[in-house]
Amino acid sequence: MIDILLFVHITIAILLIIVILMQRSGSDGISSISGGNNMGVVSAKTVGNFLTKSTIILTTLFLINAIVLANLSSKKKSDLVSKINEIEENQAENSLPIAK
């Protein structure tokens, strides 16, 4: 479960980086790769709105996934601590000296 969520988390992070780099900035950044002029079927404003909405959605998914991963990780860690404590108790009981 954690492995799948971790893969999804990394995928969302990569997509988020790509979408942020494609957004129009003051210096036009990488957004000029898509043509840069308003002569196409889709206007620059429409593309900007799509990229803004995509950024918001990906950021929300990223944060939710991070919280779920942190929650699962803390539960897994507490389970590990309880198992270690059980092993230590069993070893302490088994290591008592035998009277002759």
From Swiss-Prot:
The keyword Cell membrane applies. This is Protein-export membrane protein SecG. It is found in: Cell membrane. The keyword Transmembrane helix applies. Keywords: Cell membrane, Membrane, Protein transport, Translocation, Transmembrane, Transmembrane helix, Transport. It comes from the Bacteria. One of its GO terms (cellular component) is plasma membrane. Belongs to the SecG family. GO terms for biological process: intracellular protein transmembrane transport; protein secretion; protein transport by the Sec complex. One of its GO terms (molecular function) is protein-transporting ATPase activity. Involved in protein export. Participates in an early event of protein translocation. It is a multi-pass membrane protein. The chain crosses the membrane at residues 1-21, 54-74. It comes from Rickettsia conorii (strain ATCC VR-613 / Malish 7). Pfam families: SecG. Its main location: membrane.
